[in-house]
């Protein structure tokens, strides 16, 4: 390794795409290199730096930073820096200091290796060419980033992921109902943004109980390696910022929100995307905001992208929902009163969309649409739709375009995506089983006194230190709180008849029993869950793991795993309210609500633990209550007032806000309760009608546009069934030294051989490897099988090593053919386009590295169009390395001339390649920019920063494409030989 000096030019051996680097600084141990073309700075160990000093010799062509070219005659060195002397393209003698070399210059490593006799195996060359071909094809594919994850192809999830991941620094609220896959949507968005280089780092904040679930999901479904950060790990890094130790950081909200110092460190780290799960817990009001909200607000002001996840966006009321929208776009959502006014107009838009179906021929429908359509393009479409003389195809086209325009230009649908079960469809039936039990004397004694004595409630609240109405609807908690009462000598679970009922059902193998099924039990309080489990153990000998917020993450995961185990696992899992939030228990169909929560959204979250995408059975909801108790009255309000157990309706927050206080006062009075139930039912029906006509209707229509979703799915299926993938993987595994064994049923086992190249994901020498399949359905049915795709880490690693390294960039082979005399030479040169640009531009979607193949015979005749790559490769034979070196040495000058001529031949193709890339870019981005600008005139949810970013991106892409150059990627020398082997 040469000595380093500031100003010298070096190139990375393993990352040639970085362009020409400049030494910024160095000392005895390290050197810092700036790669200006790709906006990257790297620091290397001086003793092991994978760098090559750039030194040109006589005859080499160089490019200056000012754009003029020169052929080098000689070079001079002074104080470690080189100055080149030669003639420019006009014949003028000029000097060029190395500091003035163009940052975008490329270096023909293949040329240097070939002329020095370094040749690789012929099958390596073949694999390299095929890798470049497939990489070029896949990088431009519309399903890139969505086809690899281990997921079912569910339309609404894929539509949202595709729509959001196309945006610059997306900031959205993912608000699908419980069980519709918000975590998968967020994972898809994250995966795609990482894969296409739009983002490099992400911070994921989730409730403590969900950290391991997120960790496992991101690894198992998306092959994303995430660092779980906690206080212990943070302290292990000493004074260093722990948030800068990984690309993807997962942290507990409980930990971060309670630690101001760690919050400052997170804010100081340069993340590109922030994901916040269970965002309804971010407390805010017009008077004050909670610590959790303030933390996320500060982080989101520094991090460009933001995904907020919540199944209950309005659980804390409309103001709290507005606050979350304010996090997404503070400029757009700054006035709560104005926001409420906008909400009033969504019904008109939804009505106009429905009216489209009644045209032509309905004058009232025309008026309804006219009221909300005011731009010239939409009016022209409306005229076509209303014209009875237009044909059916014209009507349908105009109707579809108008529907898209109305959805785009109105409402919060651009920043909030909310799908409902009603809109998605295909969910199992919910069955409510009401169980009436006799109230235990200890509970009845308190309830009867409350019914007789109004003042006793105040005494009870003081004595028990409980809130109202908790003291009424959770009798076991009240019993525990009154433990000083001499009558309360037995444990509550010993006198509570719900325990006896549970034990009977758990041992009953009849139709009404649970003996052959898994049962999830949810209670509101942690102490209730703990006592319930103890009662099952002592009274029935049943071991039931408990899942509550007081457990450590490991203890919680252990309890969930014990319940999920089909063979040796527990039949029952007991959960507290908070402890079970966000968990997925869809393998279970029986849910016992030991008590009921106060808020309808919490009730829906309970049911959502089982009622999820993938649930194959009807959901059996068992609610034991005591006759004449406040709990029974609460059940009636839920069931009779709002059909809360039959399906999610999305209006529970409104109903609770309207009747919550009155309901609490009516839990001891049937007459008052009956009035509240009737009023609730009336408002419930009205709210459902408003939903169908207003904002929720718009959100549902906008959250999944079927035609676009189907197009995404078809693109994914195209890659799923790509016949080239298995062939490519088979060749690559063989060359990288991975043994593959067919196990049957479309499954193979991959195992490292002793000769395997190190560092392949999931494969370590001496270990067993893993089983894999190309079939999506088979991979989903078996957790122990990985799914191989073009996006699998193993595939990407092998392709990356080939394209970024020297593997297969030179080769020499023999061609024996009766029609060709022996001793002749051909050179097969493969050039590829190269354009140093920031990864965040995602240039590859328009102009990926593109192969230009040139085949020349020894006279310089271009045979590219006459002899295909495949046809030639099938007729070649290998040559041992010593003979190959001798042949190259003997034809050295001839090869140099062919390399020069081949470059000229390839350069003729470059303008058309750049033009095609520019055209693809303009077709997509010009249309998208025009669409956003048109939307901004009607929909304030379109951010100015988004339009500006897209405009700058378009210009940056155009500038980058203009700097595209060709470089020699690989070369194969072909020598003809006697077909008879003489």
What are these language model-derived features?
Residues 3-47, 66-68, 72-103:
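Basic/aromatic-rich interaction segments and small domains that mediate binding to polyanionic partners
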Residues 52, 367-392, 398, 419-518, ...:
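Charged, non-catalytic accessory extensions
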Residues 601-607, 612-688:
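A conserved SF2-helicase RecA2
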């Amino acid at each position: 390794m040469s000595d380093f000096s500031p100003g010298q030019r070096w190139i990375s051996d393993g990352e040639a795409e970085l362009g020409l680097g400049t030494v910024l600084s160095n000392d005895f141990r390290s050197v810092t290199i700036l790669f200006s073309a790709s906006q990257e700075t790297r620091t290397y160990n001086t003793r092991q730096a994978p760098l090559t000093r750039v030194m040109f010799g006589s005859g080499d062509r160089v490019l200056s930073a000012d754009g003029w070219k020169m052929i080098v005659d000689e070079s001079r060195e002074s104080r470690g820096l080189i100055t080149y002397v030669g003639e420019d393209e006009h014949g003028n003698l000029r000097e060029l200091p190395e500091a003035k070399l163009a940052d975008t210059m490329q270096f023909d490593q293949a040329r240097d290796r070939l002329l020095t006799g370094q040749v690789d195996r012929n099958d390596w060359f073949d694999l390299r060419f095929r890798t470049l071909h497939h990489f070029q094809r896949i990088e431009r594919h519309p399903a890139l980033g969505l086809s690899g994850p281990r997921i079912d192809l569910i339309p609404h999830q894929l539509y949202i992921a595709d729509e959001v991941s196309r945006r610059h620094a997306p900031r959205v609220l993912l608000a699908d109902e419980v069980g519709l896959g918000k975590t998968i949507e967020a994972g898809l968005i994250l995966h795609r943004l990482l894969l296409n280089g739009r983002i490099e780092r992400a911070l994921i904040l989730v409730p403590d109980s969900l950290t391991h679930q997120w960790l496992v999901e991101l690894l198992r479904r998306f092959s994303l390696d995430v660092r779980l950060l906690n206080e212990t790990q943070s302290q292990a890094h000493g004074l260093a910022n722990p948030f800068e130790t990984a690309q993807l950081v997962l942290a507990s909200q409980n930990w971060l929100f309670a630690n101001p110092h760690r919050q400052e460190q997170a804010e100081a780290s340069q993340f590109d995307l922030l994901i916040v799960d269970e965002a309804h817990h971010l407390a805010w009001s017009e008077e004050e905001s909670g610590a959790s909200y303030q933390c996320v607000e500060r982080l989101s002001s520094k991090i460009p992208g933001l995904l907020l996840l919540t199944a209950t966006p309005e659980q804390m009321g409309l103001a709290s929902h507005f606050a979350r929208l304010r996090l997404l776009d503070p400029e757009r959502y700054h006035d709560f009163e104005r926001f409420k006014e906008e909400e009033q107009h969504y019904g008109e838009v939804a009505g106009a969309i429905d009216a489209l179906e009644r045209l032509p021929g309905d004058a009232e429908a025309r008026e309804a649409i006219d009221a909300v359509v005011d731009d010239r393009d939409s009016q022209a479409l409306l005229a076509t739709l209303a014209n009875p003389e237009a044909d059916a195809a014209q009507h349908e086209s105009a109707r579809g375009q108008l529907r898209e325009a109305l959805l785009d230009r109105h409402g919060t649908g651009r920043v909030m995506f909310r799908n409902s079960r009603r809109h998605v469809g295909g969910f199992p039936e919910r069955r409510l089983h009401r169980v009436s039990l006799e109230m235990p004397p200890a509970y009845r004694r308190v309830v009867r006194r409350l019914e007789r004595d109004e003042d006793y409630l105040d005494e009870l609240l003081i004595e028990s230190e409980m809130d109202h109405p908790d003291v009424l609807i959770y009798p076991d908690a009240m019993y525990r709180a009154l433990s000083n009462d001499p009558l309360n000598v037995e444990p509550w679970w010993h006198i509570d008849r719900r325990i006896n009922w549970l034990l009977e059902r758990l041992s009953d193998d009849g139709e009404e029993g649970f003996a052959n099924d898994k049962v999830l039990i949810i209670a509101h309080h942690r102490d209730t869950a703990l006592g319930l489990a103890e009662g099952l153990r002592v009274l029935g000998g049943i071991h039931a793991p408990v899942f509550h917020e007081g457990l450590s993450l490991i203890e919680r995961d252990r309890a969930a795993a014990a319940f999920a185990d089909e063979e040796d696992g527990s039949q029952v899992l007991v959960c507290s309210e908070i402890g079970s939030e966000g968990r997925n228990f869809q393998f279970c169909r029986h849910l016992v609500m030991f008590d009921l929560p106060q808020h309808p959204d919490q009730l829906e979250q309970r049911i959502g633990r089982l009622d999820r995408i993938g649930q194959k059975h009807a959901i059996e909801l068992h609610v034991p209550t005591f006759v004449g108790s406040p709990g029974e009255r609460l059940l009636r309000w839920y069931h009779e007032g709002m059909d809360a157990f039959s399906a999610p309706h999305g209006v529970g927050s409104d109903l609770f806000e309207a009747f919550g206080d009155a309901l609490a006062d009516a839990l001891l009075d049937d007459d008052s309760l009956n009035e509240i139930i009737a009023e609730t039912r009336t408002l419930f029906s009205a709210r459902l009608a408003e939903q169908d006509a207003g904002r929720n209707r718009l959100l549902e229509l906008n959250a999944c546009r079927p035609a676009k979703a189907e197009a995404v799915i078809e693109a994914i299926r195209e890659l799923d069934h790509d016949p080239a993938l298995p062939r490519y993987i088979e060749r690559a595994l063989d060359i990288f030294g991975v043994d593959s064994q067919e196990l049957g049923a479309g499954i193979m086992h991959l195992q490292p051989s002793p000769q395997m190249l190190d560092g392949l994901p999931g494969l370590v020498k001496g270990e067993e490897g893993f089983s894999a399949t190309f079939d999506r359905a088979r991979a989903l049915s078996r957790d122990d099988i990985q799914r191989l795709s073009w996006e699998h880490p193993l595939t990407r690693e092998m392709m990356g090593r080939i394209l970024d390294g020297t593997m297969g960039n030179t080769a020499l082979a023999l061609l024996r053919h009766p029609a060709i005399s022996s001793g002749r030479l051909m050179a097969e040169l493969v050039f590829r386009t190269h354009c140093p640009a920031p990864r965040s531009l995602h240039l590859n979607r328009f102009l990926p590295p593109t192969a230009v193949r040139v085949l020349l015979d020894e006279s310089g005749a271009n045979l590219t169009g006459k002899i295909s790559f495949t046809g030639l490769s099938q007729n070649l034979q290998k040559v041992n390395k010593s003979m190959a070196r001798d042949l190259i040495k003997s034809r050295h000058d001839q090869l140099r001339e062919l390399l020069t001529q081949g470059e000229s031949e390839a350069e003729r193709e470059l303008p058309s390649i750049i033009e095609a890339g520019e055209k693809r870019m303009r077709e997509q981005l010009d249309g998208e920019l025009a669409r956003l600008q048109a939307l901004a005139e009607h929909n304030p949810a379109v951010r100015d920063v988004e339009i500006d970013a897209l405009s700058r991106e378009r210009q940056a892409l155009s500038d980058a494409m203009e700097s595209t150059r060709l470089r020699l990627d690989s070369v194969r020398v072909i020598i003809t030989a006697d077909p008879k082997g003489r």
